[in-house]
Amino acid sequence: KSCCRNTWARNCYNVCRLPGTISREICAKKCDCKIISGTTCPSDYPK
């Protein structure tokens, strides 16, 4: 699951992932998001 700081970061992550060629980790790093193993995002990454 990916968690982002705000809507801008979430949109950035979604667009980054669209082609299906860029890994979740790279998109998360680039867009200020985190990949988590659980189901609940931390409060500082609510999106």
Swiss-Prot record:
InterPro entries: Thionin (IPR001010), Thionin-like_sf (IPR036391). GO terms for cellular component: extracellular region. Keywords: Disulfide bond, Plant defense, Secreted, Toxin. This is Thionin. Belongs to the plant thionin (TC 1.C.44) family. 4 C-C subfamily. Disulfide bonds join C3-C41, C4-C33, C12-C31, C16-C27. Thionins are small plant proteins which are toxic to animal cells. They seem to exert their toxic effect at the level of the cell membrane. Their precise function is not known. Its main location: secreted. Pfam families: Thionin. Gene3D superfamilies: Thionin-like. It is found in: Secreted.
